[in-house]
Amino acid sequence: MEKRYSQMTPHELNTEIALLSEKARKAEQHGIINELAVLERKITMAKAYLLNPEDYSPGETYRVENTEDEFTISYLNGVFAWGYRTSSPQQEEALPISVLQEKE
């Protein structure tokens, strides 16, 4: 039985990320788009567990990785930041903290 990311050590997480990245590269080479999307999401989640949620603050606004969107955190629950994108302030959503970047 596989371990949950929350139960893995940083070394195990880095090993898992490397393994998933290799699988994602192969899926992309073979044009398996669905598999690539799943693997990229797993990589994002594993990276979130390498970060410290205490480095992210409710009320702060961050840029969402690979988009032009900004995201304001309402609260944190584990490695997920709950809040609102500036483009859709009525719709609350949760994002892994690994996709949040400091605004420039």
UniProtKB/Swiss-Prot annotation:
Protein name: Uncharacterized protein YfhH
Assembly notes: Homodimer.
Underlying gene: yfhH
Taxonomic lineage from the root: Bacteria, Bacillati, Bacillota, Bacilli, Bacillales
Organism of origin: Bacillus subtilis (strain 168)
